[in-house]
């Protein structure tokens, strides 16, 4: 089955049946961007500004692969390309990567400091298995920097909105403990320990390349055991390292007991300041794919509602839209860089739907099923 990239173009139209007459409707235009025998996709869901478009909107990032119905083989590269919308959606193939998976792609991020021409993606040395992050310049058509660390070969897990840093994680550990979010045969330097003190979330200065360990698995293990001394696991891993819009706090999940491993199943939401202070474990779980709004607010789920959760107060402080608008509030959600357009993507009867809400005037639309 052919896989294509498509985009939704957003505009404004009249009134929406079933809602208040004063509520404007957002119109959608769907345009197919790619075709052919290969699969084309961007990767992640748009959380925390993982955006396909460059600053001007002319170029759209993507990956080209042969198979999307399984995890890639270790020697199976994906082609990095951009779609040039100014040249009749021409595909411009740029590079290749051996660090990708069907769920998250290769963690594309446009560089916030040069969002017109530079972007990040992950790669892996096929000989050593070491993962690293690439900064690529579209104008120069080459890699302008590679963030390689022999002692802790990490890949990008989230770029700060101010372009100052990115969060790095051990994708080899993910390949072992949560395969669908890892890279097959990526080196896992901490595999011999269930809660190593030399692994966890790293923060990397984009300008200098200097890295430091923000929080270790050992710290997280100790924090978990302070809450429950009886907890047992065969190894912790971290998913969804999400930097807030001020670039001074991260929200993430520490997990264990997934993918058939023995022990207690752990799924603990955590937050920490980027200076390493304020590590907090949160009792309130607001869904597996939350999104940062303004300040210290996260968008997530409580029951049937799309809600705002205050990380400082550790409680729900508001609601976004209605259950009628967002029937699956734990769907894949994203908030635009200006924090105005909110999108909830969800599945129903084997079709994907996208509910789009504009916060400034409550305009709303739901896409057809794909």
Where are these regions (language model features)?
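Short, conserved, GDST-rich strand-edge loop motifs in beta-rich repeat architectures
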Residues: 63-77, 121-126, 168-198, 253-266, ...
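Beta-propeller blade signature
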Residues: 77-86, 132-141, 194-208, 266-275, ...
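Surface-exposed loop and turn segments in beta-propeller and other repeat-based domains
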Residues: 31-42, 93-102, 149-151, 211-233, ...
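Blade/loop signatures of beta-propeller domains
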Residues: 21-32
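Conserved blade-ending motifs and adjacent loop-strand segments that build the rim/top face
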Residues: 283-288, 321-333, 363-370
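Blade-loop segments of beta-propeller domains
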Residues: 45-49, 67, 73-125, 286
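Beta-strand-rich domains and repeat architectures in extracellular enzymes and scaffolds
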Residues: 32-78, 241
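Blade-terminus and WD-like Trp-Asp/Gly-His loop motifs, strongest in beta-propeller folds
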Residues: 50-60, 100-126, 156-165, 170, ...
